[in-house]
Amino acid sequence: MRDQKIEKLLSIAGNENRYQYFVLILFLILWINCNFMAPVLPYLEREPIVEHNNEIKTLFFEICQNSTNYKIIQRFGYSWISEFGIECNKFKIGLIGVFTFIGNTMGSIAFAIIQRYLSHKRILLISSWGFIFSIYLSTTIYNIEYFIYILISLVFMGLFGDLLCYSSLVVCEEIVSSNKRALFSSIINMGYGLCGIIFSFIFMYVQNWRYDFYIAIGLSFILYLLIKFCTYDSPRQYIDNKDEKNVKIILQGIARFNGIEKEFLEKYESEEYQKLIREIMEYDYDESNTKNENEIEMKDIDNKKIDDQLINSVEKTKPPEKKSLSCFMSLKYPSLRYKFLILCILWFGTRLISNAIALYSKALPGNYYFNIIVLFTFESFAYYVSGVLINVHFLGRKGTLYVEYLIITIGFLLLSFLKFPLPVELSLNFIIRFCESAIELVYFTYTLEVYPTPVRSTNFGINVTFGNIGSIIAPMIYEYVQSWMLLLIFALMTLFHSFLLIFLPETEGKPMVESIDELCNDKNNGKDSN
């Protein structure tokens, strides 16, 4: 397989040495920072009267005695709705969450498009500045008259935050060895849960939303510098375009980071590895197979080479040619079509259920901070456990999903038909949330593995877009559907998702698919369930 040859080529740069662990830690911190709005947003929408009844009474009493009381006002200015005085305007409160999800959806769509024109590292660098600017914009607003700028900043935060997350995940998936791919993906996704714990504690003790935003700005700038000077693009992107010069520069940079640059140059110039490079670079699609698929002529696309040459480094090269196939072209291939459509459905349903359950859990009685922190703690643990389970051979990706779907289906049915004491209800909710987060982690890993390199990023971005649409719809369904009926619907949806998994291939222990041709030649694709 071509992927095995590429992994052998990556190994001479010491790809399994400290560079991949540096990237893992860097992108974990990036995910913690980019997702900081996940725990912060509920607090910004929280009405202070609910949390501080006694202090509200004190505020009213002191207002009767004095025309102003700065300390009390400062105490209550910890959220957007209190600072802008929109406690009674449910429409504006609702817009805060809606515009955030709109930004997330725009980010996944943008990723599916611009990754065909820009390298992943360049996307990371541009998005870092956009993310910093959008956070800064929201922290400079003090007047309700400019509330629209808050909403605009939320859109840009969601857009650039998603671009940072998805680009970093793709880079990590493509540079690490196949036996560590799922584990690394799960650790990076743990950033979402860890950010919930970290920023919730900050919010709980500081109770001023601006501090969380200032921390995110400072951390974003540090991450930008580390990405710019200490990381490299995925070489697969340039291998796909047969750009050997950039591939060498990237691998040489990784070898330099690992302290084995001299050994790398010696091996790279050896006859063995030069032959390996020629085999990788001269690889072409078998046109007979693609014609048999749908009689589509791909020769012009597959044989196109990049004419722009590197001047000094990968940073100064022009973006790769538009060799990646669009998702609409990939729909013409039966081998890709059903995978793409099924994953769109699975992403939509998974995100819809996940966000609705999050809203359901946050509405439970008890200490609000405690519920949020426990919820995100469960999510972090779920990502790690799921990352371990999907590497177990007899479970794999699909087996893990079946087990998790079974657990949450039982949980939904119990909650929809039976009444439990509060501790039991809380426990069932956290178990369901645990499994739902684990399922989402599996799809992050699985989606990138199931597609060949030419369409991997594009189709991944479109699949996540469908998931974000589900996130937008979730609050409306949660608001207008009775809880027992909602849980029953979710139970039926999980059963339907389990049925759809039958038609998808197992990817555990298999190399990443590098071409449409490899996908067409895999007779077991779409039929394996082991």
Task: Write out the residue ranges for each language-model feature.
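C-terminal transmembrane helical hairpin of 12-TM major facilitator-type secondary transporters
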Residues: 399-442
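Cytoplasmic helix-loop-helix junction between adjacent transmembrane helices
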Residues: 157-187
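Loop-to-transmembrane helix entry/capping segments in MFS-fold secondary transporters
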Residues: 90, 178-187, 453-463
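Intracellular cytosolic loops and amphipathic helices of Major Facilitator Superfamily
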Residues: 1-13, 49-76, 231-335, 510-530
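C-terminal ends and interior cores of transmembrane alpha-helices
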Residues: 129-143, 407-420
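Hydrophobic core of transmembrane alpha-helices in multi-pass small-molecule transporters
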Residues: 148-163, 424-438
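Hydrophobic transmembrane alpha-helices of multi-pass solute transporters/permeases
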Residues: 1-66, 71, 82-129, 160-167, ...
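Helix-loop junctions at membrane interfaces in 12-TM secondary transporters
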Residues: 140-152, 207-210, 417-427
